[in-house]
Amino acid sequence: MKITIHRGIDQIGGCITEVATSKSRILIDLGQNLPDGEGIVQDKFDNRSAIALLTAGIDAIFYTHYHGDHLGLFHLVPETINQYLGRVAKRVALCKYQRLGYIKGREDISANEINKIEHMLPFGPEQSIEIGDIRVLPYFVSHSAYDAFMFLIEANGKRILHTGDFRGHGYLSKGLLPTIKKLILKQGKIDFLITEGTMLTRLDERVRHENELKREIVELMKQYKNVFVMCSSTDMERLATFHTANKEVIGRPFVCDDFQKSVLEIFTDTAGRKSPLFNFGKPYAFWKENSKLVKWMQDKGFCMLVRATDKFDDYLAFLKPQIDRNETVLIYSMWKEYINPTGKHANKRYLDFIGKFPVIKKIHTSGHASADCLTEVCNLVNPTSGIIPIHSEHSSNFNKLPIKDELKSKIITSSKIINELKVEILIK
């Protein structure tokens, strides 16, 4: 049996992990490298010939969630290979790529992407899927993408837990440790833990719960009448934070564009059936000709979800003369480094967009596991053979976590054979 980390050691995003036996081979994630500040992606796998070579002999691909750094190369996969994505995640991904199809000159690209997503095989939590002699069991996790999963992989008497991206400080995080303890470990010990480590370079950073963010946002909404919000359009838990905060400031419409409204409707139709927190009701889709909505926004104020696009540049230019500048704020709720003008991750489009607002407030918490959460998970799982840290700028930093000394000796960041299983780490 063999585990191959094609990509993910010492880099965030672009994750590609392979699990193989003598009879079957699967990939966990087929992520595209993250773009630079200019939006340019450097990725040697971003072409059909490279993916054809990488996936030759692969029986199936499983995606932990719909973020591009985990799913982004899906459209290059040969038709003969089955691709699996969470049931709700598939709906969100389809909504996103259908919208991209409206971009002029992108019609053929989008048609292929939409076709590939439509043919993806959906799965739900704890649904056992067998690919030859490999068994895959998905378990729900909280992340900044809804319907994200960790995978328990069983083959040749070995058990591997691949966490995907996860966190312990979201509304849906309370099930993380009980799921591992009661559903995964009760079936038997884990041999190898493949885990994300995004926060390893930010070990001292305090992560805040979504509830804490909500309280801070409510206070800002009381201070400012006109509230613009820049956050991920598919981060259900963060969107719920803003939606519930806005409901506490009575009488203000929750406004977005028609794409965002479509995403919110998916969340309401799925997670909203289980918890009122994720029932987004009837958000108001903005267009300039909707004079009734514009008048309401002028009179009562609003919470409006925005993105750094030409369309929202136009909406903002339309609204600015009609609202009081002194009562207007942009709440930026994404990673701070995107708007750090001197940082290597600075996004020029984001910087240009936020520059249009008189006041900017940063309110954010990570979609990834904190150092404390990573420690808890590692100690609880307590793998018998090895820990493979991926999705981290410096995977060797895993040694700095306060995990058991016995576990520190099991951290794997280079190729080796352990208990008849070969771990191959391909250096980028």
Regions found by a protein language model. Name each.
Residues 93-146, 156, 268-292:
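Metallo-beta-lactamase
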Residues 12-13, 67-71, 125-127, 146-147, ...:
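Active-site environment of divalent metal-dependent phosphoester hydrolases
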Residues 11-14, 21-63, 75-76, 85, ...:
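Pre-active-site segment of Zn-dependent metallo-hydrolases
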Residues 201-331, 390:
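Hard-cation-handling environments
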Residues 175-182, 208-215, 345-350:
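Charged helix-capping and loop-helix junction motifs
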Residues 11, 244, 248, 282-428:
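C-terminal regulatory/interaction regions
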Residues 7, 27-31, 58-69, 83-86, ...:
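Active-site neighborhood of phospho(di)ester-bond hydrolases with catalytic His/Asp-centered motifs
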Residues 4, 12, 18, 126-186:
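Catalytic core of the metallo-beta-lactamase
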